[in-house]
Structure formats: structure tokens, C-alpha cells
Amino acid sequence: SQSVEEFEGNLIYGAVCDEEGNSGGMLNLVPKLAKMQEEEHLEYLALLDTDYMTSEFPGDENKYVYVGTVGKLMPTFYVVGKETHVGESFKGLDPNQITAQIISRVNLNPEFCDVAEGEVTLPPITLRQRDMKPEYSCQIAKSAVLFFNYATHCSTPDQVLERMVGVAQECFQQVIDTLNQHYRTFCNMSRRPYVRLPWKARVMTYQELYTAVKAELGSALDEMVREKSEALLARQDIDTRVRANMLVEYVHGLWSDKDPIVIVYLTPPYYPHVYVEGKSEKDKALLAAVDKAVTSTQTDYKLVYKKFFPYISDLSYGAAPKDPEIIRALKRNTPGFGIFYDLPLKEMQALDLPVLDIGPFGKDAHKFTERIEKHYTFEVAPELVYKTVMNLLHDDPQ
């Protein structure tokens, strides 16, 4: 504002709410940005956020500028077991044992980190695990649900689904093998004849479940699921995660096949990763602008720029995958997509922006000791923002 005559270009400011929840503010802003882009013939260069950043590990003295952002999926396992009375425990199949095996296999396992250009996501971690038994009784649970927070740098929804289907198949079979070992030992101890337990490891995606049920019910299933989805949307006592689970439970309940199975699907929300690879002209321009801003800023802080903002943010909605197969897998395996959960995918694809975060530095986010470092936050970060913006807008960047 002190040198307006030197400023070339435009800044569009969006004040968005709900970033910590479902990004409702950003998801409402995206269509407006896309509309302005078309009607005003604007050429957007980048999407900038000023979200909080902190040390990435104990003793980390770096102050980061992030070009790109991590993505988030929530692969979910709806596990159908076989109910039985606790007095006949080997006649049933406990779904909790299967979810426990999956947790042991996946939770915080670096095998499932996503790596791009040497930058590594945090491994998946459990966000919900519970059985669906509504009350206490001496009957074991019939079903259970489990989902993970799964961070991505380059993996797509269809790839993560395929990976998790493989995990579910592996873990289900391990549970069956373990149960048969335990049952054999029990039979020997109690002098009973051993007969191998009848369970088969079966896994399918939500899309495959839907196809199987539709083969039995025909096109009537589409209307039934739409009506159920709208009824779930009308309920104010449950959130989107629960709605998705209840819809899967409903569709499975319509199927004639009642044998144990694991249904793998995606629970909302979905945050696409934005990988600024440097292949497009916009990518190259943003990377150059940030590099010049970082190298020209005189400070005692060690400034470092990295490819992925490591925390979930609204930056994810500045772009979306364009491969129709990826979008198809996302929609068909996210229960309720288009009714109680939706994304402005076409507008996100139209924006297709490289993104960056230059924010305040602080510690202990979401704790009563949360605080910021004043000098970096109010002196250095604003300078980096200013220089990056000016570098992008000027033909002769400073």
C-alpha cells in the first residue's frame, strides 16, 4: 500500500472459515474464484496461504516456506464378522480381531509413507476404531469400522484404495490362520476333534459391493441409496463420517450374502495433495519467485523452502486430479458423494494452481501454551510474502 504505483497485477483476498473442520469456507470460495477467472479473464498465478508452521523435529532451527501441500485420504474398513454367543466363541468371527490386525499392520508404519523428492509424509494413524454393537450383551459384535488418516504426496485415491485392499486381504487371512492355530490348540487341550474353521478371507471395495447388490436389485438400488443418503443428510445428530459408515452398512444389509467380509472405502473429507513439480510454466515461475525471495531476505534465521506444507490445509482445493479414472474411483468409493459430501472438482481442475504457504512461526499448536515467535512472524514472514508476490507479478523480479 506504500508503493501502489509500482504494483502491477491484482491480489484476491479470501477470508475462509472452517479450515480445521471440513474447509466449508474454502469449498464455497473455489467456485467463485473459478467464475471470476472465466468472466473477468483473469490469469491466476498461484494460491498463497499464511498458515502456521513450526519446527519439524526437536532441535530444528529452520524456518520453512512450503511450495505445495500434503494431501489427505481416510481409507476405511467396514468389517463384517459372524455373531455368536460368548459361550460358543469359536462359532463366530470377531470383527474387532480383524480391525486390530489391520491397525497393527498399518498404524504408524513407514511402509505407507508417501515419498516425493526426498520429502516424506507421516505414516497413517488411526482416527476411529469401534464395533457397531449398540449395547452390552453376551453376543460378540457383528461388524466394526476402522479408518486412518493417510497423508499423500503423490499417491492417488485409486492407488491408496488398491493398497488398502491388499492390506485387508493379508490381515484377514492372518486372522483366519491365527484362529485356526488357537482352535487346534484348544481342541487338543480339551480333547475335542479339530475341524478347520470355515472362514474365507474376502475383501471388496465399496464400488464392488454396490455392483454386487445392484446385480440383485437392479436400478432400484440407485433410488434407494439416494433416498437413504438424503435421510442421513437431514440428521443433525451425526457427522459426515458417521453418515458414510451408515450408508455402507445400509447397502451391505441389502445384499443376500451375509458371510464375513471387509469393505474398503473412502471416508470424507478428501484433501488432494498439490505437488509443484516445476514442469508447468506456473510451477517454474512460483519456484523461482520463492527462491529469489528466500535468498534475498537478510535474516539470522535459516530459511529453507520445501515442496510440501506438511499439515492439512485449504491449499489442497486450489487444484484437483484431472485423470478421469482417479476421479471416478474417488466418487464411486466415497459413500454419499454428491449428496452429503461433495467437492467442486471441475472448478478445482479449472484453477489448477501451484500453491505455497508462508506463515507465522510458533509452537504447541492447539495447546494452552500455543504461542508465536514475534520477530519472525511480524517482520520476516511478511517480507517473504511481499517479495514472493512482487517476484511473481514483475517481469524483472527483485
Regions found by a protein language model. Give the residues of each.
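Extended hydrophobic secondary-structure segments that form protein cores and membrane-embedded regions
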Residues: L11-C17, L47-D49, L127, V262-L266, ...
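Short glycine/proline-enriched loop/turn "hinge" motifs that connect secondary-structure elements
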Residues: V4-E6, V65-K72, Y136-K142, L254-D257, ...
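Flexible loop/turn segments at secondary-structure boundaries
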Residues: E20-G24, T54-F57, H85-V86, C154-P157, ...
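Alpha-helical metal-binding/catalytic segments enriched in His/Glu/Asp
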Residues: S1-M26, P75-V79, V86-N109, F148, ...
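Acidic/histidine-rich catalytic neighborhood of metal-dependent amide-processing enzymes
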Residues: S1-G68
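An acidic- and aromatic-residue-enriched active-site/binding cleft used to recognize and process polar
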Residues: V16-E19, D51-M53, V80-K82, T267-P269, ...
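An extended, acidic, His-containing surface patch that forms the Zn2+-binding/catalytic region
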Residues: R184-Q398
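Midchain, well-structured core segments that form catalytic/ion-binding scaffolds
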Residues: E38-M246
